[in-house]
């Protein structure tokens, strides 16, 4: 009887260990640990999903997020989101970040011809940072002169701005050319975020 009882206990132990699933490694879950990402939003009228979805993914993978804008007052999204920026765009230092991400929405026009935004874009390329923009924000990159000869996409209304800046406009939902990643609107926000994460993980 005792022997049978012992055999039953051993069988239960072996069965439970065989069914146990290995815990996911922290490295896999936090693939962006130690990475610093600057997200640039318009003071008024940034696109909510284009900010929220990438930020959620970046933070879930361990990245540190900083938000910059043209004002430190609470920024308002076109769908009602409210975000308190961490610093003024003019006070940021490109070398502090691994990626610079321009968020779109109608308000993103404020950076199209902004010399501060252009200087950030140009410095990001010079320092080999991941540089990304979504919706109408890729027009800022084009006007800053960094898309010449590059494959890029944008919200369809600004296709001509990209072409005028020398880009090869592809009309893709998400486009990557080296360390420059562009996307054409909120429906591409999740994939846009994945491409940025992939570039940072390389």
Model region roles, listed by residue range:
Residues 1-4:
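Positively charged n-region of N-terminal signal peptides that target proteins for export
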Residues 8, 104, 154-156:
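Residues that line or immediately flank small-molecule/substrate-binding pockets and catalytic motifs
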Residues 19-127, 131, 140-144, 161-171, ...:
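Extended, subdomain-level signal for the structured scaffold at the beginning of enzyme domains
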């Amino acid at each position: 009887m005792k022997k049978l009882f012992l055999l039953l206990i051993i069988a239960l132990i072996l069965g439970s260990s065989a069914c146990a699933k290995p815990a996911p490694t922290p490295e896999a879950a936090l693939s962006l640990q130690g990475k610093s990402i600057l997200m640039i939003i318009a003071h008024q009228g940034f696109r909510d999903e284009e900010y929220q979805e990438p930020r959620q993914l970046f933070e879930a993978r361990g990245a540190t997020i900083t938000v910059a804008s043209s004002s430190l007052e609470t920024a308002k999204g076109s769908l009602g989101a409210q975000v308190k920026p961490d610093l003024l765009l003019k006070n940021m230092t490109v070398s502090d970040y691994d990626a610079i991400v321009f968020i779109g929405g109608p308000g993103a026009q404020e950076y199209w011809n902004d010399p501060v935004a252009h200087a950030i874009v140009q410095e990001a390329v010079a320092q080999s940072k991941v540089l990304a923009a979504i919706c109408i924000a890729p027009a800022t990159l084009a006007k800053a002169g960094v898309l010449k000869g590059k494959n890029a996409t944008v919200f369809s209304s600004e296709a001509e701005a990209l072409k005028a800046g020398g880009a090869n406009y592809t009309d893709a939902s998400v486009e990557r050319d080296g360390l420059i990643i562009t996307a054409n609107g909120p429906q591409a926000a999740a994939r846009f975020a994945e491409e940025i994460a992939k570039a940072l993980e390389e």
